[in-house]
Amino acid sequence: RNKGRMVRISNYSRDCLPDLIAETGIEYVGREQGTLQLFRTEKQLKGSKADQEILAEYDSPFELLDRAGCIAVEPALAAVPSKFVGGLRLTADRTGDCRMFTVALAEKAAELGVQFQYGQSIRGIAVENGKVAGVETEMAGRITGDVYVCALGSFAPMVLRPIGIRLPVYPVKGYSVTLPVTDDAMAPQSTIMDETHKVAITRLGDRIRVAGTAEIAGYSGRLGPHATDTVRYVIEDLFP
């Protein structure tokens, strides 16, 4: 059920992106070479049937690949054929540097008159007659608007709880490393998701971003001594 919802919203985002790029001309080292979910075992390959049914239900294009098919779309995997048995490729997926994209998008929005007030601390949300009347900030006082959107991730529950809104949101910590491409022929071309270790490897121009792990550790931003061991293992295992 939740996966179906995620597929629908990701498809909507994917379909809106080309128009936004065409209109703004934003550069974000984007690629249109899909995402390859890599299976290391036959059990994982067979178990992907449920995912395939959801993708088909919501018209999300995909193809099921054997080992040779995976190597055809990601040639560097030819160096480690024993590490995987096949994959599920989401052919319409795009990749790119999300930070580069959002910074450029904010600049475009500012050119159109959008005001960004960075560094503000929220003291609370003002409610009048059962409706949000403004956001109380430390430096700018009350900020008002026609519509209010709370997009604070795992911090949203703290802000909304005082006005009676409870969100089932909790922080989950992930880890990533960014590495330079030293040999194009031995590097990934798009995004590869290691199904076993839940680690994503993404090509960002002349860099590779490797991200994964889901650690329930509260709001601590501390990095343990072995925090990136898994993501480093995966990139070295698949792209030695």
Residue ranges and their predicted role:
Residues 1-67:
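Dinucleotide-binding Rossmann-like beta1-alpha1 core, especially the glycine-rich loop
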Residues 16-19, 50, 104, 108-111, ...:
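Alpha-helical scaffold segments in soluble metabolic enzymes
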Residues 42, 67-68, 99, 120, ...:
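Alpha-helix N-cap/helix-start capping motif
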